A protein has these predicted regions:
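Helix-to-loop junction immediately C-terminal to a conserved catalytic motif
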Residues: 49
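Conserved ABC ATPase "signature" region
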Residues: 109-128, 181
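Conserved ABC ATPase signature
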Residues: 132-137, 141
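Conserved catalytic motifs of ABC-family nucleotide-binding domains
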Residues: 154
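Catalytic Walker B motif of ABC-type/P-loop ATPase nucleotide-binding domains
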Residues: 158-161
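ABC ATPase "signature
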Residues: 218-219, 227
Length: 243
């Protein structure tokens, strides 16, 4: 589905940021990028929707080079959920959720119908929430709306950059359960960045552990736990609660 082929990123000022990344993300997979601060995990994710461009190598989606995609089309087909919830403050919940379908020219009545279905699925009563503004929502409710906005138009790829790290433990656990349920239902190829190994182990089909712009180990949670590639993997699993 997504292939990184000898991908590197070098900054003239700070030097190498990513070094010769070569791996694939399978269609329908929940793929987690994890590592310490400065490891390059968020940069690796942002290459997929070309918020950042690599300096060497190729990235392909379903065999097509990213550079050959129309940029607007690529981003409309890629859902994106951030830690800082980017709901438009002057737009209602209904308007926020409908933003991408509207940009894609989808039927408004069908979008509203699907919005109601998705709100119900995530435990938010449509009649109570559709006309609310973001200022009237809790942090967990805002993140639920952000997730719905990202998936309502059936993106090929869902990118999630530490989406739950600012939430309290209860809300965080609830949203982890929710995104796992949505992923299993809609079979979206999901690329998820976190610094929390507990979260990675709970969600991932495979984990890509990075350090200093390189892949240290890529495998299932059990493989990282039971067959660590080196001492760094052992320590990271232990210190981050994954052991």
């Amino acid at each position: 589905m997504i292939e990184y082929q000898n991908v590197s990123l070098t900054c003239q000022v700070s030097g190498p940021i990513l070094k010769n990344l070569t791996f694939d993300i399978q269609e329908g997979e929940f793929f987690v990028l994890i590592g310490p601060s400065g490891s390059g995990k968020t940069t690796t994710l942002k290459l997929i929707n070309r918020l950042i461009e690599q300096t060497d190598g190729d990235i392909r989606i379903q065999g097509k080079r990213l550079k050959d995609f129309d940029l607007r089309e690529l981003r409309l087909e890629t859902g994106y959920v951030l830690q800082q919830i980017a709901l438009f403050p002057n737009m209602t919940v209904a308007e926020n959720i409908a933003l991408i379908p509207e940009m894609k020219g989808l039927n408004k009545e069908e979008t509203l119908k699907k919005s109601r279905q998705l709100l119900t699925k995530v435990g938010l009563e449509p009649d109570s929430y559709l006309d609310r503004l973001p200022k009237d929502l809790s942090g967990g409710e805002k993140q639920r709306i952000g997730i719905l906005r990202a998936i309502i138009a059936n993106p090929k790829v869902l990118l999630m950059d530490e989406p739950f790290s600012a939430l309290d433990p209860i809300s965080k656990g609830q949203l982890q359960d929710l995104i796992k349920e949505l992923h299993e239902e809609f079979k979206m190829t999901t690329v998820f960045v976190t610094h929390d190994m507990d979260e990675a182990v709970k969600l991932a089909d495979r984990i890509c552990l990075m350090k200093a712009g390189e892949v240290v180990q890529l495998g299932t949670p059990d493989e990282l736990r039971n067959q660590p590639a080196n001492d760094f993997v052992v320590e990271f699993m232990k210190n981050r609660g994954g052991a």
